[in-house]
C-alpha cells in the first residue's frame, strides 16, 4: 500500500451563480463575431472615389473635412469636466455626511475653498472671458518696450 498525499485543487470550486453571466458574455461575443464576419463577407469589396468621401446629407463636401475648433470651446469642455468632478466629490460627501461628521465638513470646506481660489485666479487671468470683447490684460510686472 502506498500512502499518497492529497492533491490541492488548482482551480477554485465552480460557482454556479456566475454561470448565467458567463453564458451571456459568451453569447454576446459569439453574436458580435458572427455579425462582423457576415458584414465582411457580404459587404461590397469594390473601392471607388465616391465611397471614400464623407457623406454630408447628400451635399457634395468641399474643402477639407477637418475644421479647427477655437480654443475657448476646449476650455469650456475642460471647465465642465473640472466642475463636474467637483460636483461628484461634493455629492459623495453629502451622501456620507452621517459617517464623516465634522472632520468631513472641514475637509470638504477646504476642497471647495481650493476650487474657488482656482476659479478666482482663472477669472482674474481672463480665462473666462472669450469672444469678440476679449481684451488682453497686461501684468503689472510686465516690461513694456
Curated annotation (Swiss-Prot):
Residue ranges crossing the lipid bilayer per the database entry: 18-38, 71-91, 104-124
Gene3D superfamilies: NADH:ubiquinone/plastoquinone oxidoreductase, chain 3 (1.20.58.1610)
Domain of life: Bacteria
Subcellular location field: Cell inner membrane
Molecular function (Gene Ontology), one example: NADH:ubiquinone reductase (non-electrogenic) activity
Enzyme class: translocase
InterPro entries: NAD(P)H_OxRDtase_bac/plastid, NADH_UbQ/plastoQ_OxRdtase_su3, NDAH_ubi_oxred_su3_sf
Membrane-protein topology: Multi-pass membrane protein
Any one annotated GO CC term: NADH dehydrogenase complex
Catalytic activity line of the entry: a quinone + NADH + 5 H(+)(in) = a quinol + NAD(+) + 4 H(+)(out)
EC numbers: 7.1.1.-
UniProt KW keywords: Cell inner membrane, Cell membrane, Membrane, NAD, Quinone, Translocase, Transmembrane, Transmembrane helix, Transport, Ubiquinone
Listed Pfam families: Oxidored_q4 (PF00507)
Family: Belongs to the complex I subunit 3 family.
Binding partners and assembly: NDH-1 is composed of 14 different subunits. Subunits NuoA, H, J, K, L, M, N constitute the membrane sector of the complex.
PANTHER family named in the record: NADH-QUINONE OXIDOREDUCTASE SUBUNIT A, NADH-UBIQUINONE OXIDOREDUCTASE CHAIN 3
Primary role: NDH-1 shuttles electrons from NADH, via FMN and iron-sulfur (Fe-S) centers, to quinones in the respiratory chain. The immediate electron acceptor for the enzyme in this species is believed to be ubiquinone. Couples the redox reaction to proton translocation (for every two electrons transferred, four hydrogen ions are translocated across the cytoplasmic membrane), and thus conserves the redox energy in a proton gradient.
Protein name: NADH-quinone oxidoreductase subunit A 1
Record organism: Geotalea uraniireducens (strain Rf4)
Gene: nuoA1
Amino acid at each position: 500500500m502506498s500512502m499518497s498525499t492529497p492533491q490541492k485543487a488548482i482551480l477554485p470550486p465552480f460557482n454556479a451563480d456566475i454561470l448565467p453571466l458567463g453564458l451571456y458574455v459568451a453569447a454576446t461575443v459569439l453574436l458580435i463575431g458572427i455579425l462582423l464576419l457576415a458584414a465582411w463577407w457580404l459587404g461590397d469589396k469594390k473601392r471607388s472615389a465616391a465611397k471614400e468621401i464623407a457623406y454630408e446629407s447628400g451635399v457634395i463636401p468641399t474643402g477639407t473635412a477637418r475644421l479647427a475648433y477655437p480654443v475657448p470651446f476646449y476650455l469650456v469642455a475642460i471647465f465642465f469636466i473640472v466642475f463636474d468632478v467637483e460636483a461628484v466629490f461634493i455629492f459623495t460627501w453629502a451622501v456620507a455626511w452621517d459617517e464623516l461628521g465634522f472632520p468631513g465638513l472641514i475637509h470638504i470646506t477646504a476642497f471647495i475653498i481650493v476650487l474657488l481660489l482656482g476659479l478666482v485666479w482663472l477669472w482674474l487671468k481672463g480665462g473666462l472671458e472669450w469672444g469678440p470683447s476679449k481684451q488682453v490684460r497686461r501684468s503689472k510686472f510686465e516690461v513694456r518696450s
